[in-house]
Structures are given as structure tokens and as C-alpha cells.
């Protein structure tokens, strides 16, 4: 009997993974708030007869005994993360701390109801691995399941994983990939920058107030989508406001988090007459192909009592316009892969501070240093101070033995060659390298489109192929 037959066929695989994904999605799980989702996972693991262990960071680990006759096989760690980037559609009322994702199947895709991101990153990979184990049909060796927290805010959970949790294992397969048919053997470093300047405001001028809104952008993942030419509404609106005659800003905000491309931005501005939006519309025209849903609107606003001082306004706008956003360099060792980039992800007022969030990624230290130095010079010149966290890169290795196993399995199952790649995202193997130097690691995931956005979705027809790849690798090791 073939592996596909043992798993019940393609439709049964799809149904099983989707059902498991729905179970895992029943609890809210924004980064640093994964405890309820972790309890849901614990219950699922106990239902499989396993004994999950939790550490102080909320990470979970559970050992899975080998199938009969496979006790001498090398131990494989299957690893994913619990948290998700909670992109929220403006005006939807969705609360990431209280509301679970509404999971839907529509047009051949798994997606949310459009109010929020789906969270297939990374729970779809987790669901595939867990469903396979629930079937009892996979002839695997000793396994360890490892689920981390706060991956989306700088791999924080991975940094707290004890080396003992990685010990006595030969291989680690990370399920946090976005492209079916690809094995990832390297990833970019990440530098999470939070810039802050004391908000300097004074009495509002005696002028009409207007609310300017840029909305409908596609947004997306600041690593996986940074090369797609999508607009950054924060930068577009800042550039427009810098050229608005007589305009005084009361507020300027946009975006959600460091590592998501912003999909919207909004400003309230005092202006003698209704602002002429034609320069902004002309700027949007350059993004019509990559960001067709972008729209701009202007409406009268209830005037706030205070507005930014002219000096603070000039500095803040110059800082926003000067921050690098987009691809900085391509990686020649892996043609077609972005080597370095920066994302201006969020801007807005926090109490009496104006805060700006950026995320730098790089496969090479010198590129990250160049971008970081450029930002530091800019921030210092305009009165912004920096708080920074980060994580190392994972150097790509084309001779990766685990990727070779995945490649053989993929060829046997599909007749196609598995792509070998480094990726322009942060992956937890970059942190695990120092904790377990001899551990052979690779990453492979299902297809996920527009992660970190309300348009996030996953094609259903690829789920059986992904499950068969995972199961085949478990049996081949």
C-alpha cells in the first residue's frame, strides 16, 4: 500500500489538515499572547497520548515514540511557531486579543473572513504535521515536536529554548515555509528598530481640519513580499504632506508592526483650503499594477486642539521620507533571492512620543551595517532615539543532507525537482545553530500567499503534496 493510500487519499488529507487547522485556530494568538492557543495545543497533544512540556517562555515540546521497528532511526525535530501577525482590516472591529480567526474555504483557498489575517503562517504547517501523527499511518522514527512563541517579533521564543530540547536529535525540519516545492537551507538576519522622539505640539491653528486617508493597499510580509513593488502608504503620505502648502499636522499614523508592509495610513491636517489630492493620486498611479486597490480620500475632520510644531513636523516628515524601504541588494549566491531590505512598518503616536518601527533583513553583515548606519545618521539628525533587537542569519548550505532527503522524496512523489533556496525572512534555525551546532536543519512549508495581510490565503490543492513530503521525509530518515 502506498503512503497516499495509507493516508486515505488526497481529499482525506486535505480534510484532515483543514480540520486540525480549525482546531488550532480556535484561540487568539498574537505574538506574546499565545497562552490560550498553547493550552489548545496541549489538549490536542494529550489527545494523541503525548505529554507536552512548557517552558517559561510558553514554548512547547513533546516527544513522540517511534513506530514499531523504527527505534534505531535518527531523531527528527518537527518545529513551528504558535503566534501570528494579526493584520486587521480598518473598521472591521476585530480584536486580536479576544477574537479567534474565522476560517473559511472559498474558491479553492483556505482564508479568513477578510477582517484579519489567516494565521496559516505558521499554523498550517503545524496542522499538517499534527494531523499526520494523528493518523498513525506514518512509519516514522523517534520524533520531537517543538512549538515556539513570539516568532513574529524577533524569534523571541526560539531564543529561550533550552539546548536540552535540541539535544540527542540529528535533524530539525522547520514547517514555517511559504512555497511548496522548496527546501530552505538559509535565512536572513533581522534587525527590529523602534525609533522614538518626544512629541512637540502646540495650540492648533485657526484653520479647517481635514482627514486624509490612504487605504486599500495589499501590505504583506516584509521579507517574502518586499520585492513585489507594493506601495508604502506611510511614506507616500509623508511625502505628500511635506509638499502641502500651509499644512499643519495634528496626527499621522499607519501600519501595524515592524515586519508587515503597511496597507494604510491616515493624517489629520489643518489647511486653509481643502487639500488638492492630485499630487498624491499621481504618486499612486506608479503602483497601479502592484497595488491596484489603493485609494485616497479627504473629508472634513473635527479639529483637534493641538498640532505639531513646524519644527517637529519638518523633522518627523524628513525622517519618514528618509528611512529606507524596499530591496537594498540581491544575493548572488542564490539568484533571484533578496539579499538585504528595509521595511518602514508602522508610525504613530504613543502617549507623548512619536514612534516609528522599521525592520531590516540581510544575508550579509556588511549590508545590514550599511542600512543600520544610514538609519542611525538619519535618526540622530532628526531627534529620534533607537531601541533595537535582532537575530542572526542562517548561512545557506547547498550540500544540506536533510534538504537532499526532502529532494529525493519530492522527486519520487511528484517527478519534479525540489527547489533549494535561502529565503529573505527570519527562521528559527538561525537561533538554534548556536544551541545545537551539529543539528542538521532545513525548512519546508505549504504554499501561503500574502502572509501578514488580511488577504492571506493558502491553496487547498497543495496540502496533500505537502503532507506527503513531510510524511515521506519522516519515513526516509
Tell me what each language-model feature is:
Residues 3-109:
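Acidic/His- and Gly-rich active-site-bordering loop/insert found
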Residues 70-148, 152-153, 159-160, 165, ...:
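Active-site metal-coordination/substrate-binding segment of hydrolases
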Residues 71-72, 273-280, 365-371:
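Short, conserved charged micro-motifs
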Residues 82-84, 146-154, 176-180, 218, ...:
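Acidic, glycine-rich active-site loops and adjacent beta-strand->loop/helix elements
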Residues 101, 106-111, 152-153, 158-361:
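Midchain, well-structured core segments that form catalytic/ion-binding scaffolds
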Residues 164, 229-244, 312-321, 328-332, ...:
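His/Asp/Glu-rich mid-to-C-terminal helical/loop segments that flank catalytic regions of hydrolases
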Residues 230-253, 372, 389-391, 396-439:
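Active-site-adjacent substrate-binding region
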Residues 332, 339-355, 359, 404, ...:
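Zn-dependent metallopeptidase/amidohydrolase metal-coordination segment
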Amino acid at each position: 500500500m502506498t503512503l497516499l493510500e495509507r493516508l486515505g487519499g488526497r481529499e482525506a488529507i486535505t480534510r484532515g489538515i483543514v480540520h486540525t487547522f480549525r482546531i488550532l485556530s480556535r484561540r487568539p494568538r498574537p505574538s506574546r499572547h499565545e497562552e490560550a492557543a498553547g493550552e489548545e495545543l496541549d489538549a490536542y497533544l494529550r489527545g494523541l497520548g503525548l505529554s507536552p512540556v512548557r517552558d517559561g517562555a510558553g514554548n512547547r515540546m513533546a516527544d513522540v515514540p517511534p513506530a514499531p521497528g523504527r527505534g534505531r532511526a535518527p531523531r527528527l525535530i518537527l518545529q513551528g511557531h504558535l503566534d501570528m501577525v494579526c493584520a486587521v482590516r480598518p473598521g472591521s472591529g476585530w480584536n486580536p486579543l479576544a477574537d479567534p480567526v474565522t476560517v473559511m474555504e472559498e474558491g479553492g483557498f483556505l482564508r479568513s473572513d477578510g477582517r484579519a489575517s489567516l494565521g496559516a503562517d505558521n499554523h498550517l504547517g503545524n496542522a499538517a504535521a499534527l494531523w499526520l501523527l494523528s493518523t498513525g499511518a506514518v512509519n516514522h522514527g523517534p520524533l520531537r515536536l517543538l512549538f515556539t512563541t513570539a516568532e513574529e517579533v524577533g524569534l523571541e521564543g526560539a531564543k529561550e529554548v533550552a539546548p536540552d530540547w535540541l539535544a540527542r536529535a540529528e535533524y530539525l525540519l522547520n514547517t514555517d515555509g511559504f512555497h511548496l516545492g522548496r527546501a530552505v537551507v538559509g535565512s536572513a538576519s533581522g534587525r527590529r528598530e523602534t525609533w522614538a522622539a518626544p512629541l512637540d505640539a502646540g495650540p492648533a491653528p485657526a484653520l479647517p481640519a481635514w482627514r486624509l486617508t490612504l487605504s486599500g493597499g495589499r501590505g504583506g510580509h516584509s521579507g517574502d513580499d518586499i520585492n513585489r513593488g507594493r506601495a508604502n502608504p506611510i511614506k507616500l503620505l509623508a511625502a505628500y504632506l511635506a509638499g502641502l502648502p500651509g499644512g499643519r499636522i495634528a496626527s499621522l499614523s499607519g501600519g501595524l508592526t515592524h515586519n508587515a508592509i503597511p496597507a494604510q495610513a491616515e493624517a489629520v491636517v489643518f489647511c486653509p483650503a481643502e487639500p488638492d489630492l492630485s499630487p498624491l493620486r499621481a504618486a499612486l498611479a506608479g503602483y497601479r499594477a502592484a497595488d491596484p486597490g489603493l485609494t485616497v480620500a479627504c473629508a472634513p475632520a473635527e479639529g483637534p486642539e493641538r498640532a505639531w510644531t513646524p519644527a517637529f513636523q519638518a523633522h518627523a516628515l524628513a525622517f519618514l521620507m528618509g528611512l529606507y524601504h524596499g530591496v537594498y541588494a540581491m544575493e548572488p549566491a542564490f539568484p533571484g533571492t533578496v539579499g538585504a531590505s528595509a521595511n518602514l512598518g508602522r508610525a504613530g503616536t504613543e502617549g507623548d512620543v512619536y514612534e516609528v518601527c522599521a525592520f531590516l533583513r540581510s544575508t550579509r553583515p556588511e549590508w545590514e551595517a550599511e542600512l543600520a548606519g544610514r538609519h542611525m545618521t538619519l535618526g540622530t539628525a532628526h531627534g529620534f532615539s533607537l531601541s533595537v533587537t535582532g537575530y542572526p542569519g542562517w548561512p545557506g548550505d547547498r550540500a544540506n543532507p536533510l534538504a537532499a532527503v526532502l529532494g529525493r522524496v519530492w522527486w519520487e512523489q511528484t517527478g519534479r525537482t525540489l527547489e533549494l533556496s535561502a529565503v529573505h525572512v527570519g527562521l528559527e534555525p538561525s537561533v538554534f545553530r548556536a544551541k545545537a551546532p551539529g543539528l542538521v536543519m532545513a525548512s519546508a512549508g505549504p504554499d501561503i500567499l500574502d502572509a501578514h495581510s488580511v488577504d492571506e490565503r493558502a491553496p487547498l490543492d497543495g496540502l496533500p503534496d505537502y503532507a506527503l513530503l513531510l510524511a515521506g521525509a519522516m519515513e526516509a530518515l
